């Protein structure tokens, strides 16, 4: 694939993002662009992310600089992956809400979006989160469920069995398969019927 768009939300797993981006560039895509929410930039500086991708896009006040907006970014990507996807971003996407550059780009995406949740097990098991995940799937998106592994838990400050993202090389392979399965779907959606 030539163009991979990665959306990054504010989960502690964002600290591992450079490893994922490096794997994506090495094994998956020629070009990688990243959209970061404000919460994500508070945990990982965009300047660090820029070292392992082609361009970083942020939520910020409009400027006179010509930057691609959500429609252009959505059309640019051959595959769009949200990594990590918080419960908040999953909920907004499932309910058609666009409150920032990332969520409006999700709404504008002409291809199915791949969500890689990083959510605390207590939240992940809530009925509302599972409903939102099922809504995304019904809408044609893919959700790659977290796996169980020993990981650092922020709230306890200890290493515990928890839900974590799929390892970078394996995730790159999964994304390649998803891209191949959906390749004919890439492109602009058909125009709406007249009268709408």
Q: What would you call each of these model-derived segments?
A:
Residues 1-115, 120-196:
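A cross-family phosphate/adenosyl-ligand binding-site feature
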